[in-house]
Structures are given as structure tokens and as C-alpha cells.
């Protein structure tokens, strides 16, 4: 078995479209993150609402249930969960290009990048213009002014070079990181011998 790994987005396959391209075999495997699935699978997107779990203990109790839900839902899309990558409790901040944003009033004057439908709805109720932009498009969206600010875990900000396109950050809240699912096309998975699965 040979596995060739590609960086997210490098094949032109968008995170938010994974339920559409993975079953077709456009790539045999890919990371599935429920937060990006609000358009195609609203139930999966709503399994773990941002801010609903605030401690490591609560998070660890929820993970087995999340795995079961994911396996059941992904089966309907022709995707097999080959593995899960758990994330720790993270601390989201609002990273902004041109000025610090420390109040809701100031945030209402900005265009904000978020990663899930529930976040769009929450910020909309607060009078903030928010839109889902995938992680692989976030840097360019900030650089070109598509958005002024982005919600992102501070721990991982350097991995996507946010320091190059933003000069300010304000802490927002703790987030329980949804596990990534290493999903495989069911057709591709079933074609492998059991010893390779």
C-alpha cells in the first residue's frame, strides 16, 4: 500500500465540499471536520456547538459519542471513518488586520471569518457580519480584505501564517475541538484487503 499525502487544499478539493468529493474517489482519503459541513450535513455541523463544552473532562466524555454519530452519519455519504484525530480544548481569538477589536461594538464594523454555520448564526444575532471561509482560503481572504478579522485558535495561528496578515488578536472563548475524521471513500476502502484496512 502506498500513501501519498497532499497538503490541505493543494488538490483544489475544498474542506466544505468533502462530502461531495470524497465518495467519488477524487482523493481516496481526506480529513473530515464537521464544522465545515453545515451546508451539506447540518446535523453533523450541529453535533458540538462551539462553546458548549468548556473543560477537558467534559470533552473526553463526549468523544466516544461523537465517534458513533460521525460513523453513522458518514455512512450515509459513502464515507468510512478510518480513524479519528482528537483535538484538545483550544482557545479561540479574533485576529484582525488593521486594528484591535476588543468590543462587540467594534466587531460590528468588521467582516468576520468563522468556520461553522452555528457561528455565522450566533454572530448574526449579535449584529456581526460573519461568513464561513475554509482554513485553506483564510490567509488570502484576510490579505485581500474579503474579511477584516478571523476567529482562529491562537495555538495554531502561526501554522497558517496569521502573523503575516494580522497585527492584532483578542481572546474570544474556549472551544472543544471536534475530532477530525480520517475519512475514506467507502468504495476505495472496501477494495482494500482487510489487512490493509
Language-model region placement:
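N-terminal secretory/targeting leader peptides
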Residues: 1-58, 72-197
